[in-house]
């Protein structure tokens, strides 16, 4: 039998190789940013690293079906719901950031002071492309692999740490790098919750959320206020939304779980388990019917045995009375013959009585679960109980006939002797 489950060693090796290739390519691709002549806030060349790493891992490692399970492009109702959330959550973060700028900095600038000559449409297209190539590698490929051995929450933590290392910005000081790490980790945790239980349909949700977030950053960074203040606002706002969204999601799922369990424990009328009680009542009724049938069979067996005994006595009396009208010698010979017949009849009647009792006992120990079996057993028992009575009558007639023939023969012999 073929086992399609990915092994623990390959699981770990896939994650390790993906991360190493991604980090190595991000370092090598930095030099190509100036070559292509595109500003870094429009499109980062280093963002191609996760896409290339995912393609290499798919080609190198086996279990292609498992690796490609997170790359489904179909649409479902849940995907549409998460797409709406992927647009709403960045808007909430943007509102919190703008409020923070107004409260703590007294103003905010909608665009950076440099690069204003670039059309907004070019920036939007560039951010969509960046979001697609990054999320293809990290969410559609890597998180799908990690979730084969972990649940979604812990898989999001692992992928979030790797994504934060990949997106680390050490251009400024340590404090800036720390807030940037907080921002990217919170960003990744929100994305992990958004793509939860979408059955591999992750690319649309991840791309939409990523592009919305990165596109919104250009409205909050201000050269006059400083990059440190901007990254603080972005990081804290994203962290607040991440905690709120994930916490609310856990609460809703917990309530749904408790409600479902309570509904299963407190069964209402006409529920799907009512047939259990019906079966118990049916079995109880069948048991009572079987017990009553057994008692009737036992009574019939006893009555049959008594009838056989009475028939035996009648036969003996009849056979004994008929020879008494003849002479002494003839009576002695006839009586001797009848005694022999009676003894054999007594043995046969004893066997018949034993069979009747055994039939009654077999009915008593017969299975009681099936109505058809009970009916067939009752018919067989009645038939077996009727057979001894019929046989008794036939046997009695046979004995009387034999006795009459013997008497006639004896009379003929006596008349011949007298002559």
Curated annotation (Swiss-Prot):
Keyword Chaperone: no
GO cellular component term of the entry, any: plasma membrane
Transmembrane segments annotated in the record for this chain: 9-29, 41-61, 84-104, 118-138, 152-172, 175-195, 202-222, 231-251
Keywords in alphabetical order: Cell membrane, Cell wall, Membrane, Secreted, Transmembrane, Transmembrane helix
GO molecular function, a single term: endopeptidase activity
InterPro entries for this protein: Rce1/LyrA-like_dom (IPR003675)
Source organism per UniProt: Staphylococcus aureus (strain MRSA252)
Topology of the protein relative to the lipid bilayer: Multi-pass membrane protein
Known partners and oligomeric status: Interacts with N-acetylglucosaminidase SagB; interaction is direct and facilitates peptidoglycan processing. Interacts (via N-terminal region including transmembrane domains) with sensor protein kinase WalK (via N-terminal region including transmembrane domains). Interacts (via N-terminal region including transmembrane domains) with sensor protein kinase SaeS. Interacts with other histidine kinases, perhaps via their transmembrane domains.
Regions of compositional bias (Acidic residues) in chain numbering: 372-382
Its biological purpose: Involved in bacterial cell envelope homeostasis. Regulates peptidoglycan processing by N-acetylglucosaminidase SagB, perhaps acting as a scaffold protein. Pleiotropic regulator of gene expression, probably acting via interactions with multiple two-component systems. Plays a role in the abundant deposition of the immunoglobulin G-binding protein A (spa) at the cross-wall, a subcellular structure that initially arises from cytokinesis.
Renumbered residue ranges of the record's region Disordered: 273-419
Predominant localisation class: membrane
Coiled-coil residue spans: none
Protein name: Lysostaphin resistance protein A
Domain text: C-terminal region not involved in glucosaminidase activity of the SagB-SpdC/LyrA complex.
Localization annotation: Cell membrane; Secreted, Cell wall; Cell septum
A single GO BP: CAAX-box protein maturation
Basic and acidic residues bias: start-end ranges: 282-299, 323-353, 383-419
Family label: Belongs to the LyrA family.
């Amino acid at each position: 039998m073929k086992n399609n489950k990915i092994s623990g060693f390959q699981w770990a090796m896939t994650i390790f190789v993906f991360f190493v290739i991604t980090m190595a390519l991000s370092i090598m691709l930095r030099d190509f940013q100036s070559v292509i002549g595109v500003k870094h806030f429009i499109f980062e060349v280093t963002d191609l690293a996760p896409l290339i790493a995912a393609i290499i891992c798919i080609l190198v490692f086996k279990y292609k079906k498992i690796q490609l399970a997170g790359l489904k492009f179909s649409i479902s109702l849940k995907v549409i719901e998460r797409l709406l959330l992927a647009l709403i959550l960045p808007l909430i973060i943007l509102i919190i950031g703008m409020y923070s700028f107004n409260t703590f900095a007294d103003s905010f600038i909608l665009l950076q002071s440099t690069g204003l000559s670039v059309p907004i449409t070019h920036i939007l297209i560039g951010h969509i492309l960046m979001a697609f190539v990054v999320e293809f590698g990290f969410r559609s490929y890597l998180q799908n692999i990690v979730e084969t051995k972990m649940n979604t929450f812990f898989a999001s933590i692992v992928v979030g740490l790797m994504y934060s290392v990949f997106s680390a910005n050490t251009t400024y000081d340590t404090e800036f790098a720390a807030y940037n790490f907080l921002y990217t980790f919170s960003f990744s945790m929100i994305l992990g919750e958004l793509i939860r239980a979408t059955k591999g349909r992750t690319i649309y949700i991840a791309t939409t959320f990523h592009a919305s977030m990165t596109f919104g950053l250009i409205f909050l960074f201000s050269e006059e206020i400083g990059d440190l203040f901007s990254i603080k606002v972005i990081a804290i706002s994203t962290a607040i939304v991440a905690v709120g969204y994930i916490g609310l999601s856990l609460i809703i799922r917990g309530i749904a779980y408790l409600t479902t369990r309570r509904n299963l424990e407190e069964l209402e009328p006409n529920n799907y388990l009512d047939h259990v009680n019906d079966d118990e009542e049916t079995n109880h009724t069948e048991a009572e019917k079987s017990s009553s049938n057994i008692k009737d069979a036992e009574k019939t067996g006893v009555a049959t045995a008594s009838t056989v005994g009475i028939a035996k006595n009648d036969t003996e009396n009849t056979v004994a009375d008929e020879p008494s009208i003849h002479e002494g010698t003839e009576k002695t010979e006839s009586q001797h013959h009848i005694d022999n017949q009676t003894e054999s009849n007594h043995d046969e009647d004893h066997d018949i009585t034993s069979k009747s009792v055994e039939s009654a006992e077999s009915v008593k120990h017969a299975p009681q679960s099936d109505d058809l079996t009970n009916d067939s057993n009752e018919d067989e028992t009645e038939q077996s109980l009727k057979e001894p009575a019929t046989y008794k009558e036939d046997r009695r007639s046979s004995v009387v006939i034999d006795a009459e023939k013997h008497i006639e023969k004896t009379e003929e012999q006596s008349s011949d002797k007298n002559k």
